[in-house]
Design a protein with these regions (language model features):
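Acidic, serine/proline-rich low-complexity intrinsically disordered regions
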Residues: 3-214
Length: 214
């Protein structure tokens, strides 16, 4: 018999009340097979981080495949769908001239390479679909252990969440800011199985509906 799952709707309600969250907590799973009980995403082309907003604000559940993620060539690699584009891991793109020849995020390619070498990465080819759902509906999903929960918080809420995770295990909290948000808050905890805190990235703050204090 499969193990009995927690009551995710109750957990979501308690977390949102304790943290005073206005919007939903998002669950995203990285899997090799599409879940049979979720619909395929059929909306307008979005980046992986923008899809988080679809869940946060609209409460939708869906799965995506590789072809749904070409709006962001960074997420294609970080989520384990496909190989990187030319100039990505070499650091040339991250130091090139904006907008057509790069993003000028680093002064030298070596600095970009250091970031990527130190960042968690999902192995390419191991992911065939990414599925999204609100935490309160997670009992309707496959719950195969390949999911992570994503909270969009202000500093005070983040502090309380961090202290709460340490209450029953001790230690310290780790964060990662530098890579894309999809790598920091999706690939990071997926690979390490540890909570990961991030200030986000330029792309997420441009394309997601994140306020200045989140």
């Amino acid at each position: 018999m499969p193990p009995k799952l927690p009551d995710f709707a109750n957990i979501s309600e308690r977390l949102r009340k304790a943290l005073r969250l206005e919007h939903r907590i998002v669950v995203i799973g990285l899997s090799d097979t599409p879940p049979a009980n979720l619909p395929h995403y059929e909306g307008e082309p979005l980046k992986a981080c923008q899809m988080l907003d679809t869940v946060r604000f609209e409460g939708k559940s869906f799965y995506t495949v590789q072809n749904d993620h070409y709006e962001c060539k960074n997420a294609i690699r970080w989520l384990g769908f496909d190989e990187s584009y030319e100039g990505h891991f070499s650091g040339e793109w991250a130091t090139g001239d904006y907008p057509d020849n790069g993003r000028a995020l680093f002064r030298a390619p070596a600095f970009s390479r250091r970031m990527y070498e130190e960042s968690p990465k999902v192995r390419v080819g191991t992911v065939k679909c990414a599925y999204y759902m609100p935490l309160e509906k997670a009992n309707e999903g496959p719950a195969r252990g390949d999911e992570v929960a994503i909270f969009v918080l202000n500093p005070r809420q983040a502090m309380y969440l961090a202290r709460g995770t340490l209450y029953s295990r001790g230690g310290i909290c780790y964060g990662m800011t530098g890579p894309g948000t999809c790598q920091s808050v999706i690939a990071g905890p997926f690979c390490t199985r540890q909570p990961m805190y991030s200030l986000g990235c330029f792309g997420a703050r441009q394309f997601m509906k994140i306020t200045g204090n989140e």
